[in-house]
Every structure is written in C-alpha cells, then in structure tokens.
Amino acid sequence: MLNLCHALRGVRQFSCSVIVKVKCASCSIKLQDQDPSKPGYYTKPKSLPDSKLNPDLQDLKYLLFSQDIQLSKQAIQNDPDLKTKRDLLLRVICKRCSNALHHNNYNPEEFPESTLNDILNYVPRGSNVMHIVPFVEFPLHLDPNVLKRNDLDTTLVLTKSDQVFKDKNAVSKKVPIFMKQFLKNTLRIDSNKTFAISALKNWNISMFYNYFKNYTYLLGNPNVGKSTLINTLLQKYLGYKVKIDSTGKINSPSEEVMQEAFTNPKNFFKIQAAGVSHIPNLTRSVQAYQVGGKILFDLPGYSTSTSRLRLEELIDERWLQRLRKTDLFNRKHIKQKTYESMKGTSQGGCYTVGGIFYLVPPKGSINQIVKYIPGPSKTFKNIEKGIDVFNSCNSSSGTHPLSRYCGIKSVICEKSQYKRYAIPPFIGSIEIVLKDIGYILLRTTGRYEFKGLHEIWIPRGIQVGIREPLENLIESGYQRYIETNGKESSCPRDRPIISSLYEMAPDEADTLNAVKKSYLEKTEKDLSARRFVDDDPYDLVQHLEKKKNPYWYYQW
C-alpha cells in the first residue's frame, strides 16, 4: 500500500511529489497538479488551507478541498495518524471525475473511447480473460473476436441476468447448456466456459469466484457491469485494491489493510470499491484487486466503433441515468409482463419511449408491447407528429404538457436524423434490443396473417437487433434437452434465433422485397447461412409456421 510517511515527508505545499503516488479512486489514473490539459489534473484552490494545521494534514486538506469531500473536524484534529491520512488520500478523485460525478459537468471529449486493440495492450499473452457481456442486451456486446483468440484463455460471463429471468435456477443450470450450443452452432466456437450471473442479486457469485483463476482480466464494453461485479466480490470476500509498480509487480497487501476489513468494514469497502457510474469510459487505467486469494484486473471498457454518435449527445441526461443505472431496473416487468396494446394504422401510427425509437406496426395488425426500458411510453399518429411534439417539449423548457414523455435532446429535430429499419418476418413474439438502452417485447396477436413488415426508426448511431424471447427460448430448450437426455439441442438448429435489421430508404414501398435483396447481399460471403432464397417472398410469408424466421441473419 502507499507509504505515506515517505510520500508526505517534508512536504509543506501540495505538489506532484505527493499526488503522483496516488491514483484517482474513480478512474484509476495517476493524479497530478501540473498540467490542466492532461489526465489526472487537480484544480488548485484560490487560498490554501489554514497554515496552522499540521503540515501533513494541510496537504490532505488541500487534496480534498478541490472535490468537495467533507472532512469531519474530529478526523482532522483528533485523529492525525498515518492510517487516517492514507484513508483520506485513497478517497481522492481527479477533477474530470469529480466534475462528471458530483457537479453534472460532463464533457464527452474527456471520456474518449478505446478500441479492443487499445485495451488488449494491457493484457499479456496467455492471460485468463473474462469477457463481460450484459445478458439483457444479448447478442449485442458479445464479441466473437475475443472468444476466438488463441492467445487468451477466455470465459464468457453474462451479467445482469436478473433483468431477463425470474429466478436464478435458469441462470445456474439452463443458460450454460444453451450458450454452449449457441456458440457452437452460430459461431463455431466449442466452449463450455460460460457463466450467467447477477451481481446485484448475488446470483452465482460464489460459483463464479470458485471458477475464475488467479490473475484474471475483466474485458468488455463500457457499462456492462464489470465494476458492479467487482464490488460484489469485494464485499463478499473482503477484497481490496492493490498497487502495481513500474515493473508490473503487484505489491503484497499490508496487515494494516486486512485489520481494517474487520474493525471497520463499511469504511474499508468505501475506500476499496470500484468506481460504478452511469458515465461510459469512466475507467481509464487498469486497477488490480485482491479478491480472496486471487488477483482480478478491471480493464477500461472498449468500443467496437470510435466514430459512432454518443448517447450523451442524443438522450436527456436524466433519462440516460435511468437507462444505465442497473439498480434502478424494475423487476416487476420480468414477473408480471404487463403489456400495452397497439393497432397498426394506415397513417403510420407509432409507439415510442421518449423519442429514442419509433415502432411502426403494419396496418391492421394488433400488437402487444412489454416495455423493459425505463421511462413512460407514448403513441402518436405518425413519426412526424412525435418529432414535432418532442421539438416543442425541448423548446418549452419543461412547460409543455407532454414534457414528461420526452427523453431526447433538441439535436434530433428532423425525421432525416433517424434511420428506418425493417424487421424481418416473424410469427408470435420477438424482443427488439437497442444497444446501451434495453429491450422491448413485441407480440402480434390473433390468427396469423401477413399484413406487412414492422418498422422501427432509430437515431443514427444506435445499434439494434432482434432475438426470439430469451427466457422462453432457454426454458423450452432446456426442457427439450432434458426430455431427450441431451439428444436434442437446447438451442434451436432449424432456424436463426437472432438477427440484425435491414436499413430501408425513407421512401421504400416494397420493404419485403428490399429485405430479401439486402439479405442476399449480407450473406454473399456466408452461403451456408442462406435459407429460402428460391422462395418468392410473398409466398414465403404465408407459411411462417413451417418456414420460421426467413431472412433472419445477424451480422457480427
């Protein structure tokens, strides 16, 4: 741990000689006070703390002054020992994180995205890696490039499973069987190393701990649940941060650190906890943790594209926090599955949550929608009406009667700023998944009759896909697998169960034929995935009971 006797010896004014030995407790970057344009910077206060204070405590007071951390007088005056100084230092966060977390001053340029290759520079060849994927948004976030690497020993960890399943029985027993067969059938990856967990509900955490090896790296996109998982492990196994020197050597934890875990566990965890935030790309450096007898590394999140538009530029800050804060998810939707009804109209009636998307059912169809995305929903006569209303909401400073339904910013002010996607044909129910946002269940009711394709309009830059309803898919597959003693696959082999959507021109009238054309283009280099290519599209959709999920194809 940090040697404060050495770090603070003879220091009367705050300087880099102190702070260089301290990392930001939120993003793990080294702290400095020399260059405002560089990461880890502190803003000097206009006046120094009371010079009558002990010199060492004066430095600590300075550290905490710039980020509004409250210190009790008792801690300053009556407990001036090295342990207190160390604890106070370990709570410090940099100006960037302080502004974003405590002052709602968020500058996306200060939170740059990283690529997979950027992050893999932190990971030695042959390392143990946990690929962290939020199950709630499956298959989005799943990166075959990580699972297929021969230079890493990779395990797939599916987080946030409580947002998909009612209880942990399916998570423990059924998901691993399903995923093993899904990976083999879909990606030709032969692996039985899959865990489904919920850090918030403590589902499978003990099993996960027993499985992962010493010196394991957590790898995934931003906001997939890495830090929440780490904090659950820290609490359960009295874990703590450890430091790495310039040679990569991990310093052994001190007896003093371990003693505090028993004497003051609440304060101990507060200091050691990983920085959990709704803000993406908060972590900027590797942070090592001692969890029981194992070392675990938290890596910064990586993005598959550094050019996509950020959600922070599109979605209202309060709505975005609700979308990203896992602990705010209402599980009653999982248990009750309360639906909203909507009938497709000739005017293009649409369903939206905050203007983040517009779902347009075909004329005459009767639909049920179960919403797993926070925020109130609203229907409009057509997309143009919805966009017009939300423009009025943004210009009214919250006084518009429909302002509570508006979750987007004024930058999305025209229909041209949305992409039009056609959903390939389906029968029954599907789940529409929006990356970093959530999903909705869409169900067509009544006797099947093809009335046209469903459409969804989404702001440019948001990734979307569909899947068969995940919970039902895994439950029914497991039942089939057990009844046949494993002879039949838990994951269907007769049809694709996930698909990308097909972008359409705004004025495209024959969307079904346009979907087939796009399907043939996407599968040009994957001929084995093609199905029903010789069928006439309009004949094909009359027989979906026998020819399920035509033109479904997921582009990894």
From Swiss-Prot:
Location within or outside the cell: Mitochondrion
Statement: the UniProt record of this protein carries the keyword Transcription: no
Database matches in SUPFAM superfamilies: P-loop containing nucleoside triphosphate hydrolases
Primary localization: mitochondrion
Cellular component terms per the entry's GO annotation: mitochondrion
Organelle targeting peptide span: 1-21
Domain CP-type G as annotated: residue spans: 113-305
GO MF: GTP binding
General function of this protein: Interacts genetically with prohibitins and thus may be involved in the mitochondrial lipid metabolism.
The protein, known as: Genetic interactor of prohibitins 3, mitochondrial
Lineage: Eukaryota, Fungi, Dikarya, Ascomycota, Saccharomycotina
